[in-house]
């Protein structure tokens, strides 16, 4: 496919040692040739492909900067088009000046994600691989980066292609049975159809099962610490973060607002939320803090419910009523001051056992991180070689395919084959959309609009 010539700064905004201007399109080499001079090469066309050439960049006769120029010929480039990269010094003024000169000589400003969009449209990568690039760029933890790298490598694409192959073969066999029913063609049996559907459903189920874990490593787990005033919520936040982020005093009600910080637990971003202690109060500011606490609980993925080891109070029971429908763990703090509560009592009132800790003495705090991890992960990801589904679009398309296949299986013995094939084709269409083999232009535009300019 041929497009016009686009250009953008591909490195982050700011000061750095090197900045890169990327040019792509059928006239990219011609455009770059108008603004550079080389002491070694007479023209840009004399510079070998993939050779790092020292050049000088000019605006007409005005010298702008020295740079390294690398050119790539289609289809062997990131976009699949002719591409030129100009690596200049990294100041924003010089980068913007070079970009302006490139635009003045025949290119246009690239839209967000347009380079990767062209790579997709030119068959350099599929849609799921393109989406993996966003995750690699935005990775906040090593775990997400590793998973995104697997997706970029094509691990997810391979699994999707395997499901598609099963469905495509099944549809072909059914249509052959319909079209050549009067000839000597073996008709596919309902049992064979059911076996293929079950195989595809099992593969889809295994992928869907990874989504909650995938979502956790991508978006983070919103984890709210709740309890009555002075139970140790702020101290817990500070200990987990290993820094003094929240103010800690012996005065109940010190924390009056919601404080959020991110904790990395073995590659999973945990958004820790310290909240105001929940109690009846006449203090207007503290009351607002309590209201914000309850709102934080509503959106929580996980709640850390803290009580004290000297006994369960009426306030504890009232607080628990607001979190009992959430995923939660129970911490029993201040064991250094004595324990007047049993696991049986905790389990009877709150539905599960608690973890006894002493923040003041740093006792059993390693169990807290372990409990958080166990509460949020659907599976053990240590040594996990499979790719995790992290993208909601992929999950929704897999669910659609699952629904169509389930419908086909339910109707297998009561509907004719031509009706059955409609559900199978719809399932295949949903599967194809994951890798972009059958996707609307609007969806493509929406996906690539999430990229930054220059990628």
UniProtKB/Swiss-Prot annotation:
Binding positions (K(+)): 230, 249, 251, 254
One example of the protein's molecular function in GO is: GTPase activity
**Any idea which UniProt keywords this protein has?**
Cytoplasm, GTP-binding, Hydrolase, Magnesium, Metal-binding, Nucleotide-binding, Potassium, tRNA processing
Where it sits in the cell: the answer is:
Cytoplasm
Identify the GO cellular component terms for this protein: cytosol
| Gene3D superfamilies per UniProt | P-loop containing nucleotide triphosphate hydrolases, Probable tRNA modification gtpase trme, domain 1, tRNA modification GTPase MnmE domain 2
What does the note under cofactor report? Answer: Binds 1 potassium ion per subunit.
Q: Which residues bind GTP?
A: 230-235, 249-255, 274-277
Judging by the UniProt lineage, the source's domain of life is Bacteria
Q: Which GO terms describe its biological process?
A: tRNA methylation; tRNA wobble uridine modification
User: EC number(s) per UniProt?
Assistant: 3.6.-.-
Essential cofactor(s): K(+)
* Record: residues binding Mg(2+): 234, 255
Query: Per UniProt, where does (6S)-5-formyl-5,6,7,8-tetrahydrofolate bind?
Result: 22, 85, 124, 455
Where do transmembrane segments lie in this chain?
Answer: none
Q: Which InterPro entries match?
A: G_TrmE, GTP-bd, GTP-bd_TrmE_N, GTPase_MnmE, MnmE_dom2, MnmE_helical, P-loop_NTPase, Small_GTP-bd
Q: Domain named TrmE-type G: which ranges? A: 220-377
Spell out the family assignment given in the record's similarity comment.
Belongs to the TRAFAC class TrmE-Era-EngA-EngB-Septin-like GTPase superfamily. TrmE GTPase family.
Report the protein's function.
Answer: Exhibits a very high intrinsic GTPase hydrolysis rate. Involved in the addition of a carboxymethylaminomethyl (cmnm) group at the wobble position (U34) of certain tRNAs, forming tRNA-cmnm(5)s(2)U34.
Subunit arrangement?
Homodimer. Heterotetramer of two MnmE and two MnmG subunits.
* Name of the protein in its database record: tRNA modification GTPase MnmE
UniProt organism field: Caldicellulosiruptor saccharolyticus (strain ATCC 43494 / DSM 8903 / Tp8T 6331)
Task: Point out the gene that encodes the protein.
Answer: mnmE
């Amino acid at each position: 496919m041929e497009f016009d010539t686009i250009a953008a700064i591909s490195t982050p905004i700011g000061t750095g040692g090197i900045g890169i201007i990327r040019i792509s399109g059928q006239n990219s080499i011609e455009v770059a040739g108008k603004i550079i001079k080389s002491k070694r090469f007479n023209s840009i066309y004399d510079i070998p492909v993939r050779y790092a050439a020292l050049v000088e960049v000019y605006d007409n006769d005005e010298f702008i900067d020295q740079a390294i120029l690398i050119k790539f010929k289609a289809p062997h480039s990131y976009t699949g088009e002719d591409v030129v990269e100009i690596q200049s010094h990294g100041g924003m003024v010089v980068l913007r000046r070079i970009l302006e000169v490139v635009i003045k000589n025949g290119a246009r400003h690239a839209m967000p994600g347009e380079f990767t969009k062209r790579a997709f449209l030119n068959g350099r990568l599929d849609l799921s691989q393109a989406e993996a690039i966003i995750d690699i760029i935005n990775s906040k933890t090593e775990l997400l980066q590793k998973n995104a790298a697997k997706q970029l490598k094509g691990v997810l694409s391979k699994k999707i292609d395997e499901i598609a192959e099963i469905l495509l073969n099944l549809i072909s066999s059914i249509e052959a049975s319909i079209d050549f029913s009067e000839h000597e063609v073996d008709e596919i049996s309902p049992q064979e159809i059911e076996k293929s559907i079950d195989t595809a459903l099992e593969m889809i189920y295994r992928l869907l099962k990874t989504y909650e874990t995938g979502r956790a490593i991508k978006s983070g787990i919103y984890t709210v610490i709740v309890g009555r005033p002075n139970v140790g919520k702020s101290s817990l936040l500070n200990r987990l973060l290993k820094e003094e982020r929240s103010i800690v005093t012996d005065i109940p009600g010190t924390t009056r607002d919601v404080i959020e910080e991110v904790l990395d637990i073995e590659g999973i971003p945990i958004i820790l939320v310290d909240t105001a202690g929940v109690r009846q109060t006449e203090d207007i500011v503290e009351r607002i803090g309590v209201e914000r606490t309850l709102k934080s609980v509503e959106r929580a993925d996980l709640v850390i419910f803290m009580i004290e080891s000297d006994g369960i109070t009426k306030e504890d029971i009232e607080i628990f009523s607001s979190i009992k429908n959430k995923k939660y763990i129970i911490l029993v703090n201040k064991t250094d001051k004595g324990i007047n509560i049993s696991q049986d009592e905790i389990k009877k009132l709150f539905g599960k056992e608690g973890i006894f800790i002493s923040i003041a003495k740093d006792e059993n705090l390693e169990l807290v991180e372990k409990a958080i991890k166990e509460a949020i992960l659907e599976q053990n990801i240590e040594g996990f070689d499979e790719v995790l589904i992290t993208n909601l679009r992929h999950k929704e398309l897999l669910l659609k395919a699952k629904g169509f296949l389930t419908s086909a299986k339910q109707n297998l013995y009561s509907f004719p084959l031509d009706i059955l094939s409609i559900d199978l084709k719809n399932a295949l269409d949903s599967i194809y959309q994951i890798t972009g083999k059958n996707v609307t232009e609007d969806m493509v535009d929406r996906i690539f609009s999430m990229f930054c300019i220059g990628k």
